[in-house]
């Protein structure tokens, strides 16, 4: 049968008086304002108090053609009481087109051979990366200031990316993180790119704690030897039946690598990739009771 998104709607009302026969409406739109569904959820008295159940929205998903970010807006008609929430819709089944891509979790001999011959390699390195392991990434940002809390994690403050890059064609995103990134970013290892040159830019850059500001990230593409490489520390594979955002990002990556758009602009030496698995930066234990501006670390 048809797949529906079913959403219960509750209203907390703390106005001066109860609302009589209030009519509550909804609409579901995409990023361009196209309306996919709208209507009346219910009409009822809304007493003063918390979480008054109004009704539910049943939204059919069969007409959503591809992965998409949508927004549901709920309003008490005739008032300025309105709220809205983003949500993401992904295909129920996913086919991975990966015949011409060698997938591995390290820079092994076969990966080197394929890159030498001009092939495509996807390295899903995860926790095997050592250069960057001192940086602890949560989905939530740095608490207040790492210099006042003895470098306790988390050490990052979100991500930065170009949402128009073709790698994200099938994974709708803004230039920053949003809730669809939770299962991908929370506690994901990062890579440090301090030796990759000042102009090097990963496709998904993690933003370091501001008073150290290392160049770090979780996914990059590069021309390596004679081939093309994408390397990531994100978990794209585990429990795909539950982690549907991770599953969708994996599809988007593989489809991009199989497309004519896969032309990395940056060149990286094979030794630089290898050092991500061997080099260790160490943890800068920087701590001050003064203003964090007094800390001027020299990060090598």
Report the location of each language-model feature.
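Short alpha-beta junction capping motif
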Residues: 99-146, 223-226, 232, 253-256, ...
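Short, aromatic- and glycine-rich surface loops/edge beta-strands on solvent-exposed regions
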Residues: 65-78
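Short beta-strand elements
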Residues: 42-45, 80-96
């Amino acid at each position: 049968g048809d797949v529906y998104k079913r959403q219960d709607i509750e209203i907390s009302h703390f106005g001066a008086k109860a609302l009589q026969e209030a009519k509550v409406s909804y609409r579901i739109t995409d990023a361009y304002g196209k309306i996919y569904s709208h209507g009346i959820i219910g009409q009822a008295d809304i007493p003063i108090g918390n979480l008054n159940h109004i009704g539910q929205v049943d939204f059919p998903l069969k007409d959503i053609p591809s992965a998409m970010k949508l927004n549901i807006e709920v309003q008490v008609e005739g008032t300025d009481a309105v709220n809205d929430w983003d949500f993401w819709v992904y295909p129920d089944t996913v086919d991975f087109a990966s015949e011409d891509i060698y997938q591995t979790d390290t820079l092994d001999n076969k990966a080197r051979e394929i890159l030498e011959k001009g092939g495509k390699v996807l390295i899903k390195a995860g926790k095997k990366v050592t250069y960057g392991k001192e940086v602890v990434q949560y989905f939530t940002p740095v608490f207040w200031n790492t210099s006042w809390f003895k470098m306790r994690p988390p050490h990052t403050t979100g991500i930065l990316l170009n949402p128009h890059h073709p790698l994200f064609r099938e994974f709708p995103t803004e230039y920053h993180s949003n809730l669809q990134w939770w299962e991908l970013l929370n506690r994901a290892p990062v890579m440090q790119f301090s030796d990759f040159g000042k102009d090097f830019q990963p496709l998904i850059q993690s933003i370091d704690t501001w008073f150290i500001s290392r160049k770090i990230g979780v996914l990059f593409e590069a021309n390596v030897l004679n081939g093309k490489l994408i390397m990531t520390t994100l978990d794209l594979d585990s429990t795909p039946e539950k982690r549907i955002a991770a599953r969708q990002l994996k599809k988007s990556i593989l489809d991009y690598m199989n497309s004519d758009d896969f032309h990395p602009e940056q060149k990286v030496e094979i030794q630089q990739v290898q050092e991500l698995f061997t080099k260790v930066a160490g943890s800068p234990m920087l701590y001050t009771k003064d203003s964090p501006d007094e800390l001027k670390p020299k990060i090598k």
